[in-house]
Every structure is written in structure tokens, then in C-alpha cells.
């Protein structure tokens, strides 16, 4: 078990999401990004984060695809990461401990390939955009949800000049 391997201390609090929620500040004209002034991680902490992301990536791809966004976010910040990255890793481990019985259910369907996709403009570090997608088999009315065939959660390498380009 990955949680035992990483000597994870279980929290009494239940974690409902794999990453921390950043509340939206309505009414502001400009939404500023948070600056991370925390100290950088040590080499041992970087190795720990790499081991956790590597171990949980298999589980996330196979069973709990909700972890993919958090894993992608943590993995992109690992080399220049700070203690905030380490806290995000511990949050992900708390989520995994709170939700140990993930499952995917496949049911008989009309075999219609459905796709939900989206992109977020300038959401990732270094002014990059993020893309996400969810492909599954279901019915033509999109009322039947089935287990995923492909889940995409990645950062687009190139900087887009407008919000329409990543879409």
C-alpha cells in the first residue's frame, strides 16, 4: 500500500478533493495569482514528491482519475518546488487516504463515443494554459455515464496569445 510505504499519518479530517480549493473573489476586476515565497524543498523532499507522484500516477490512470490534475500540477512544480509543493503532495496523500475504495463502473451502452473537453487560459505557471478531456462510451443523449476510455489532464507547452487558442 502506497500510504504505508510513504509512512503517511492519517488525518481525522475527510479530504473531498485531491488539491486545495482556491476561493474566487467575486467583484474584483483583476484576479491576481498567489506568489510563492516559501523556502525551496531539500533534495530528500524533492525525491519524496517524485516517488509519491510516480506511485500515485498508476493508480490515478487506472482507477481514480480525479487525481490526475493534482498529480500534473505537483509534477510540473517538483524541480523548482517549494514547501507549498510538499504541502500539496501531503494534501493528495490525505485525499488518497480519505477515499481508499475508488472504482470505475462500466455498463452496457449504445457504444457512442462522448467527449467532454475544456482548456484554461494562462492558468498554469509561466503563462501556460491547461487542457483537459474525458472520453467515454455512452448513449446518444449523453444521459448514461460510463467509465472513461481516456482522461487528459496536461499543461499545453506553448504560450497562447488569446483564450480562444487553447480551446
Where are the language model's segments positioned?
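Long, low-complexity, charge-biased intrinsically disordered regions
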Residues: 1-167
Amino acid at each position: 500500500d502506497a500510504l504505508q510505504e510513504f509512512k503517511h499519518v492519517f488525518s481525522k479530517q475527510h479530504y473531498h478533493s485531491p488539491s486545495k480549493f482556491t476561493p474566487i473573489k467575486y467583484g474584483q476586476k483583476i484576479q491576481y495569482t498567489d506568489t510563492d515565497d516559501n523556502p525551496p524543498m531539500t533534495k530528500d523532499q524533492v525525491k519524496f514528491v517524485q516517488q509519491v507522484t510516480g506511485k500515485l500516477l498508476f493508480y490515478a490512470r487506472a482507477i481514480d482519475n480525479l487525481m490526475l490534475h493534482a498529480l500534473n500540477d505537483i509534477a510540473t512544480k517538483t524541480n523548482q518546488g517549494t514547501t507549498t509543493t510538499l504541502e500539496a503532495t501531503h494534501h493528495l496523500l490525505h485525499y488518497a487516504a480519505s477515499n481508499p475504495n475508488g472504482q470505475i463502473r462500466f455498463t452496457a451502452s449504445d457504444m457512442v463515443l462522448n467527449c467532454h473537453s475544456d482548456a484554461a487560459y494562462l492558468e498554469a505557471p509561466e503563462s501556460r494554459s491547461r487542457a483537459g478531456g474525458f472520453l467515454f462510451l455512452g448513449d446518444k443523449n449523453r444521459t448514461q455515464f460510463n467509465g472513461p476510455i481516456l482522461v487528459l489532464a496536461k499543461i499545453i507547452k506553448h504560450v497562447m496569445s488569446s483564450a480562444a487558442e487553447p480551446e
